């Protein structure tokens, strides 16, 4: 990928990687093709049920031949300009990995953790936090994230691993594969940053119901809410047969 910043330009070898299921979202696929094609990047995918294993196998294919990897989730929405902006920030900032802001599905939180601070201690940042274009974070996501291959090669394998909690369950207090990666990433001497002024979309499936009492004539709910709430629509839905 040819990166231009002001009067300077450099060729950066970028590998776009995806861990994917057999079926996916066409909106995302067309988004990816339109975002990567202008930069001459063809995505590499590995299909399987286990996110971490698939992504590690993708990384292993390119870690010795490319400068950076761009990890992409199959529900992320972004543009060619997003890719260009993130790579420019990565190269200029000196960080070893850089993620954009992305909101968690079915939640009101952005997916990153402040260094040394648990979500129980703090869940917001001040306005002046955004004045610095890249801020250090402890963990992030893989939705549209650049990682230097030199940083990956510092890490021992496995790069991804799910760890149960002290009770041997995954119902809280456990470590998911993506968080395991970022913790090992930092332990290997690497720095992860978040682009405070660059965001990507997160596609999520909603259920829309007709309504006679709500302005606009409809009410919506997340699919998870429907299944976890006794298969009931939200208040204001009209005509539902229980």
Regions found by a protein language model. Name each.
Residues 1-49, 53:
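N-proximal low-complexity "stem/linker" segments adjacent to membrane-targeting elements
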Residues 2-15, 157-242:
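C-terminal catalytic/acceptor-binding lobe
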Residues 15-19, 33-35, 75, 87-89, ...:
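Polar low-complexity intrinsically disordered regions
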Residues 42, 75, 96, 191-193:
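Residue-level detector of anion-binding/catalytic polar loops
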Residues 56-68:
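Active-site nucleotide-sugar/metal-binding loop of Leloir-type enzymes
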Residues 59, 79-165:
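Conserved catalytic core of nucleotide-sugar-dependent glycosyltransferases
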Residues 66-67, 93-95, 190:
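Short, high-confidence coil segments that cap the C-terminus of an alpha-helix
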Residues 66-77:
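Short beta-strand-to-loop acidic/aromatic patch adjacent to the donor-nucleotide binding site
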């Amino acid at each position: 990928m040819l990166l231009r910043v002001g009067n300077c330009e450099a060729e950066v070898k970028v590998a776009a990687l995806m861990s994917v299921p057999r079926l996916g979202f066409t909106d995302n696929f067309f988004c990816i093709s339109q975002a990567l094609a202008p930069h001459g990047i063809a995505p590499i995918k590995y299909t399987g049920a286990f996110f971490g294993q698939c992504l590690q196998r993708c990384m292993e294919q390119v870690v010795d031949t490319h400068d950076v990897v761009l990890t992409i989730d199959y529900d992320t929405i972004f543009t060619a300009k997003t890719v260009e902006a993130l790579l420019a920030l990565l190269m200029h900032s000196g960080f070893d990995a850089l993620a954009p802001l992305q909101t968690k599905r079915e939640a009101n939180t952005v997916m990153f953790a402040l260094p040394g601070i648990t979500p129980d201690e703090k869940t917001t940042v001040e306005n002046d936090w955004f004045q610095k274009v890249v801020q250090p974070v402890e963990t992030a996501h893989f939705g549209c994230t650049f990682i230097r291959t030199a940083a990956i090669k510092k890490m021992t394998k496995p790069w991804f691993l799910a760890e149960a909690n002290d009770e041997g369950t995954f119902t809280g207090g456990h470590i998911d594969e993506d968080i395991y990666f970022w913790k090992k990433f930092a332990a290997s001497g690497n720095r992860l940053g978040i682009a405070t002024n660059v965001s990507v979309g997160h596609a999520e499936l909603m259920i829309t119901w007709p309504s006679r009492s709500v302005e606009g004539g409809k009410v919506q709910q997340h699919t998870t809410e429907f299944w976890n709430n006794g298969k009931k629509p939200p208040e204001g839905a009209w005509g539902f047969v229980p």
